Regions:
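Primarily recognizes the serine-hydrolase "nucleophile elbow" in alpha/beta-hydrolase
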Residues: 269-323
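Aromatic-rich carbohydrate-binding modules that target alpha-glucans
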Residues: 37-83, 91-113, 148-153
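Short beta-strand element of the alpha/beta-hydrolase
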Residues: 174-186
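Active-site machinery of serine-nucleophile hydrolases
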Residues: 186-253
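A domain-start/cap signature at the N-terminus of enzymes
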Residues: 105-177, 365
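Gly/Ser-rich "nucleophile elbow"/oxyanion-hole loop immediately N-terminal to the catalytic nucleophile
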Residues: 171, 175, 234-278
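C-terminal catalytic histidine-bearing segment of alpha/beta-hydrolase fold enzymes
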Residues: 331, 337, 342-352, 356-394
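Bacterial N-terminal signal peptides
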Residues: 13-23
Length: 394
């Protein structure tokens, strides 16, 4: 779900009562400060800021606010000037700030002075009530269904909604199909459940099928909201958390995939089993391919947040050359978030690491940097068809 339903187009201003602008040090930085949050907000709540400066990502780890004495603050790393729009969230658009009735509100707006240095101070009145929040119409195609609203994740001691896409000819054929596993399932198929836009994976695959592609089954697992960072990194980040990625990948490889293979006409081998994600989902997809190359033989890594877990580089360098080698498809943008050079640099470093292990460019390894690419759903939606075709083609 997008902020104010249309986060980028919505230009309504909202100045929170009591907002204060204060002079800041002579640096091109903006500090955002919350002096209070709604009663009942957990003491250990992860509060994020999402805005036009980070692609409206509701749970970007580098935009998590720091708690201090009952208040929360963050200083943006990137220079900003002029008007900015933003909202505060608890890690998803289903838990963004709202009004006292639990409904969505317009984006906050603030014009940074010409120096680019300022502090915005405000308060959150309430968090959105998902039960009363208006939602856009569903955009999922007929091939999409909910495999389970509460699929057991024994490895993590919780449940999760899991989505399923079946190819157009699944019901009328006896074919077996490759399977692609995706993260952040809320964003994969349906605008009614997505935040900041959906990928349109179902429409993309339907179109490719109409042009002669053999088709694929897609299994998309919802992220866990405030558990997202924990589940999408095998290693702890001192500031942002993490550390449950091993268990999450074990769930995918040992529980979810066997279930799908038992109940649907799949081609279960690694050459027909892919995993793909963006940002933190890109990080955990890469890790899944390294840990289980005999399971996930096709790996899509979009805008990977490798900075979150630098241990991924030593993990890749230590890969056993005797094990199967997956195909890895990397894509990142030259305009990624607050520090695009970090994403470009880290992708290049990982590609060099894999090439040093013998992965062959063009057949086992593909990497591209898109000049216009940003850390945003529209970018990943656009890049999906090319990644899918490269991973499963030939």
């Amino acid at each position: 779900m997008t902020p104010s339903l249309h986060p980028v187009r919505d230009r309504l201003s909202m100045l929170v009562a009591g907002a204060v602008v204060a002079a800041a040090p002579v640096q091109a930085q903006l500090t955002l400060r919350l002096t209070s949050v709604p009663p009942g907000t957990p003491a250990d709540a992860a509060i994020y800021v999402a805005g036009n400066f980070n692609g409206w990502n509701a749970a970007a780890p580098e935009y998590r606010m720091t708690a201090e004495g009952g208040e929360y603050f963050i200083t943006l790393n990137e220079p900003v000037d002029g008007p900015v729009e933003f909202k505060f969230t608890l890690g998803s658009w289903d838990t963004a700030e709202g009004d006292l009735a639990g409904r969505d509100i317009a984006n906050r707006t603030f014009t940074v002075p010409g120096t680019g240095a300022a502090t915005y101070t405000g308060a959150v009145t309430a968090w959105v009530d998902p039960a009363t929040r208006p939602r856009p119409a569903s955009t999922a195609t007929s091939g999409v269904s909910v495999l389970s609203a509460a699929f057991p994740m024994a490895e993590l001691g919780r449940t999760r909604r899991v989505w399923l896409y079946l190819p157009p000819d699944y019901a009328t054929s006896r074919k077996r199909y490759p399977v692609l596993y995706l993260h952040d399932g809320q964003n994969v198929f349906d605008a009614a459940t997505a935040f900041a836009g959906e990928w349109g994976v179902d429409e993309a695959l339907d179109e490719l099928h109409a042009r002669g592609d053999g088709g694929a089954i897609v299994v998309a697992v919802d992220n866990g909201g405030q558990k997202r960072l924990d589940e999408y990194s095998p290693w702890k980040n001192a500031r942002y958390g993490g550390g449950e990625g091993d268990a999450y990948v074990d769930f995918l490889a040992k529980t979810l995939k066997p279930y799908v293979d038992r109940h649907y006409r799949t081609r279960p081998g690694p050459a027909s089993t892919g995993i793909l994600g963006s940002s933190m989902g890109g990080l955990i997809s890469l890790y899944a391919g390294l840990k289980y190359p005999e399971v996930f033989g096709r790996v899509g890594v979009f805008s990977p947040a490798l900075w979150f877990s630098p241990s991924i580089f030593s993990c890749a360098a230590a890969a056993d050359p005797r094990r199967p080698r997956p195909r890895f498809y990397f894509v990142t943008g030259a305009q990624e978030g607050a520090a695009p050079e970090v994403y470009v640099r880290d992708q290049g470093r990982m590609v060099e690491t894999l090439a040093g292990l013998g992965f062959r460019s063009g057949t086992e390894l593909s990497a591209v940097v898109r000049p216009d690419g940003k850390h945003a759903e529209w970018f990943w939606r656009r890049e999906f068809p090319a990644a899918y075709q490269w991973l499963f083609g030939g």
